[in-house]
């Protein structure tokens, strides 16, 4: 079987969804700039050899509608001979794009793919036009479509306290801020034009959503937002609303080597799994277990892990049941996570994978895992290996 490898991976800075730096920048532009960036950074690649552009996006309407993958690729000047498709596995959409490209390469159905994802949550809110079938209530809990309530449920089932959630959120902001000021995000962030608070055009080079002033004391005063009476999940322990895109150049290994392109990581294994929709945040556990089994390794073999922080109340049960509580500070989300950076839905899968690969390089690590939960009860996971 042929090997699928990551040649390059970049992301936009994460912009605040409410009056943020990308308030005047469309989702197609965020996407197209990254596509162009990959080609500029890898001039050995002939764009005419691109098989397909696979782009994750959840809210495929308004500016994100009518196959945003094709719209963005045309904006980017990618040859019209390349295909383009938009995929939707909710929060796991751009990781699904990674998997689709990898499967195509492994089975000989193409050797060069641009993949990624985008979500402009400021322009297209996450609940825009959502209309669940009434019959779903016969099969899943009625609150399963409300992500915050599923986090409350998962946290209660696993005995996660408010204080544990607050501490996890503080850690996310502190680590993301440290990564910013120490330049650890510099290699993965691709600068995009946006606008500052005065409306002036600027090149955005840093994430806008990190709150370095976050403390246990500042979080303690926040009220629960999803279950005001008995809940523990607050805005401060939930992933921030942000706008952003991420992208990767994925190729067949021998072709990349023949062109003299870097092999930043090999895709070792992939998996998806389902779980009860009422505790959708638990999905990373069964997905990770399947991916590890397919890779022939155990969780102890992993050097670095990126777990998407939809909610602290969701992340901590996954960490616990994967047997990772004792190594959180050595292995997990070392540059912070979505609580600090935000979770632009269609962007996040490739974003956490990009952050993971850069962390693996920084730490000279061999094996890494990127995994995330998915609304209505799914998980997705990818094991990467540096070679």
Swiss-Prot record:
GO biological process, one term: fatty acid beta-oxidation
One cellular component term from this protein's GO annotations in UniProt: cytoplasm
Catalysed conversion reaction: an acyl-CoA + acetyl-CoA = a 3-oxoacyl-CoA + CoA
Keywords attached to this entry: Acyltransferase, Cytoplasm, Fatty acid metabolism, Lipid degradation, Lipid metabolism, Transferase
Signal peptide extent: none
GO molecular function: acetyl-CoA C-acyltransferase activity
Main location: cytoplasm
Subcellular location: Cytoplasm
Superkingdom of this protein's organism: Bacteria
Alphabetical list of SUPFAM superfamilies matching this protein: Thiolase-like
E.C. number(s) listed in UniProt: 2.3.1.16
UniProt subunit comment: Heterotetramer of two alpha chains (FadB) and two beta chains (FadA).
Function: Catalyzes the final step of fatty acid oxidation in which acetyl-CoA is released and the CoA ester of a fatty acid two carbons shorter is formed.
PANTHER family registered for this protein in UniProt: 3-KETOACYL-COA THIOLASE FADA, 3-KETOACYL-COA THIOLASE, PEROXISOMAL
Name this protein carries in UniProt: 3-ketoacyl-CoA thiolase
Native source species: Shewanella oneidensis (strain ATCC 700550 / JCM 31522 / CIP 106686 / LMG 19005 / NCIMB 14063 / MR-1)
Name of the gene this protein is made from: fadA
């Amino acid at each position: 079987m042929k090997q699928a490898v990551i040649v390059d991976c970049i992301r936009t800075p994460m912009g605040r969804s409410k009056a943020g730096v990308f308030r005047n920048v469309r989702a197609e532009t965020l996407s197209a700039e990254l596509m162009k960036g990959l080609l500029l950074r890898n001039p050995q690649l002939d764009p005419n050899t691109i098989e397909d552009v696979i782009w994750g996006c959840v809210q495929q309407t308004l500016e994100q509608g009518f196959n945003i993958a094709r719209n963005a690729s045309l904006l980017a000047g990618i040859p019209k001979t390349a295909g383009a498709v938009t995929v939707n596995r909710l929060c796991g959409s751009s990781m699904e794009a990674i998997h689709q490209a990898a499967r195509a390469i492994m089975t000989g159905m193409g050797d060069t793919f641009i993949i990624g994802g985008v979500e402009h949550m400021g322009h297209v809110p996450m609940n825009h036009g959502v209309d669940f079938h009434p019959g779903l209530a016969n099969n899943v809990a009625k609150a399963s479509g409300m992500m915050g309530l599923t986090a409350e449920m998962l946290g209660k089932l696993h005995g996660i306290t408010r204080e544990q959630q607050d501490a996890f959120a503080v850690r996310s902001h502190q680590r993301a801020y440290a990564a910013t000021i120490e330049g650890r995000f510099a290699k993965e962030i691709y600068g995009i034009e946006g606008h500052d608070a005065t409306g002036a055009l600027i090149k955005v080079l840093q994430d806008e959503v990190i709150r370095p002033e976050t403390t246990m004391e500042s979080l303690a005063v926040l009220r629960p937002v999803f279950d005001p009476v008995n809940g523990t999940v607050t805005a401060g322990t939930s992933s921030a609303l942000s706008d952003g895109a991420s992208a990767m150049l994925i190729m067949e290994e021998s072709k990349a080597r023949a062109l003299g392109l870097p092999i930043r990581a090999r895709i070792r294994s992939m998996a998806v799994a389902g779980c009860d929709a009422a505790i959708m945040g638990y999905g990373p556990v069964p997905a990770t277990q399947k991916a590890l089994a397919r890779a022939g390794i155990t969780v102890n073999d992993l050097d670095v892990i990126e777990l998407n922080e939809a909610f602290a109340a969701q992340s901590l049960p996954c960490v616990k049941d994967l047997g990772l509580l004792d190594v959180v500070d050595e292995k997990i989300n070392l540059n912070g996570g979505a609580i600090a950076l935000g979770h632009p839905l269609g962007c996040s899968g490739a974003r956490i994978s990009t952050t993971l690969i850069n962390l693996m390089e920084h730490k000279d690590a061999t094996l890494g895992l990127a995994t995330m939960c998915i609304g209505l009860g799914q998980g997705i996971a990818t094991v990467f290996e540096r070679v």
